[in-house]
């Protein structure tokens, strides 16, 4: 613990009132990555033992934690993290990297318009099992479904691509989502995996709902992604959040953890962008009843809403002064299984701020 960083800031997630809490974070280690250019993205493996870095030098770095007992046996005061691999293949800047929910797969994307899928091997190596060139412009973001091996990517070409593995063939793009009129910067799945949020240069956030194959039949629409052992689905644009931002929305993130409060049946969504705002949205699903009224959804498994109601739970203007806010992330789920109340943000001012 060689340095202390004090990060100030805070707004109440239900009222939006600043509480000026102070959080003290200890800088544990600085990792000299060896990357020759900017490190654009980092991702933890689900077990926290592997760290992946995506760089503008077109490579992905892989780092493993050296167990404390091994370091103690060796009497080493060396680094806690050690590079065990570099993934090469991209022809240009790597923009994003992400692990699958079980850590078996890793995805990377870049300015070369490609998405790469890597698989962890028994010898701790990673093997490329798919190169997907479906976008017509550079790819900004890749994320994995929270419960399945479904991959999504967002691009400068204004689209979102969804990919699955066909056991009889290879990884392929099974559907393209189009609703945005400009670059799609960020994606985030809901904890239940039935909804997807996308944010864009067009100052909107779209909420997409996963429609099952059976429901597709009822609605008279075609399901996508039908493979052996998989019935497929359709991702349908369900709600557009607009009018809250005055510039591109660079980041959107769904709070992990299930909510038992009907008002938060879809949980909390945080977004930030070029106008310096950070906004927390509460998403509520309501159903038409036989009496012509509406009732709240009661659980995350009720995935067929008649309407979605969005409430601004908190908003911070000029969160990083007068500069862009590039990224916002919720803290991991609390130890008691409840959704987190802490948010980290990164801005063009070079600061990381913590909000609660």
UniProtKB/Swiss-Prot annotation:
User: Which keywords does this Swiss-Prot/TrEMBL entry list?
Assistant: Repeat, WD repeat
Looking at the keywords, is Iron-sulfur present? Answer: no
Q: List the disulfide bonds.
A: none
Q: Which InterPro entries match?
A: CIAO1/Cia1 (IPR028608), WD40/YVTN_repeat-like_dom_sf (IPR015943), WD40_repeat_dom_sf (IPR036322), WD40_rpt (IPR001680)
Q: Name one GO cellular component term.
A: cytosolic [4Fe-4S] assembly targeting complex
SMART domains named in the record: WD40 (SM00320)
The residue spans of each WD repeat are 34-73, 89-128, 134-173, 179-218, 244-291, 319-356
**Which CDD domains does this entry report, sorted A to Z?**
WD40 (cd00200)
Pfam family of the protein (one): WD40
- Per the UniProt entry, what are the Gene Ontology biological process annotations, in alphabetical order? iron-sulfur cluster assembly
Role played: Essential component of the cytosolic iron-sulfur (Fe/S) protein assembly machinery. Required for the maturation of extramitochondrial Fe/S proteins.
Family according to the record? Belongs to the WD repeat CIA1 family.
What is this protein's record name? Probable cytosolic iron-sulfur protein assembly protein 1
**In which organism is this protein found?**
Malassezia globosa (strain ATCC MYA-4612 / CBS 7966) (Dandruff-associated fungus)
Output the lineage of the source organism: Eukaryota, Fungi, Dikarya, Basidiomycota, Ustilaginomycotina
């Amino acid at each position: 613990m060689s340095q202390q960083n004090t990060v100030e800031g805070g707004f109440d997630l239900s009222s939006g009132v600043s509480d000026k809490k102070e959080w003290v974070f200890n800088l544990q280690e600085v990792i000299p990555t060896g990357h020759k250019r900017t490190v654009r993205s980092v991702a933890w493996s689900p077990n926290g033992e592997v760290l992946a870095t995506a760089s503008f030098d077109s490579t992905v770095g892989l780092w493993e934690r050296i167990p404390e007992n091994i370091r103690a046996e060796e009497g080493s005061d060396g680094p806690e993290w050690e590079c065990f691999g570099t993934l090469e293949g991209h022809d240009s800047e790597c923009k994003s990297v992400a692990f699958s929910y079980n850590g078996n797969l890793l995805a990377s994307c870049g300015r070369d318009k490609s998405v790469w899928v890597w698989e962890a091997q028994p010898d701790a190596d990673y093997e490329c099992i798919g190169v997907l060139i479906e976008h017509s412009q550079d790819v900004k973001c890749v994320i994995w479904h929270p419960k399945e091996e479904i991959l999504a990517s967002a691009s400068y070409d204004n689209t979102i691509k969804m990919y699955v593995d066909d056991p009889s063939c290879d990884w392929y793009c099974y559907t393209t989502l189009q609703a945005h009129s400009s670059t799609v910067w960020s994606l985030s799945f809901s904890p239940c995996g039935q909804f997807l949020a996308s944010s864009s240069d067009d100052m909107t956030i779209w909420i997409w709902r996963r429609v099952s194959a059976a429901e597709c039949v009822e609605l008279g629409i075609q399901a996508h992604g039908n493979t052996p052992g998989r019935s497929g689905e359709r991702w349908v644009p369900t709600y557009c959040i607009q009018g809250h931002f005055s510039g591109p929305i660079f980041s959107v993130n769904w709070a992990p953890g299930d909510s038992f409060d009907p008002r938060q049946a879809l949980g909390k969504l945080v977004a930030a962008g070029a106008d310096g705002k950070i906004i927390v949205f509460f998403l509520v699903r309501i159903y038409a009843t036989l009496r012509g009224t509406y009732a709240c959804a009661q659980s995350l498994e009720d995935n067929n809403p008649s309407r979605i109601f969005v409430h601004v739970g908190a908003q911070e203007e000029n969160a990083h002064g007068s500069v862009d806010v590039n990224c916002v992330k919720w803290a991991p789920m609390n130890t008691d299984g409840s959704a987190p109340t802490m948010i980290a943000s990164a801005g063009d001012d070079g600061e990381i701020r913590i909000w609660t």
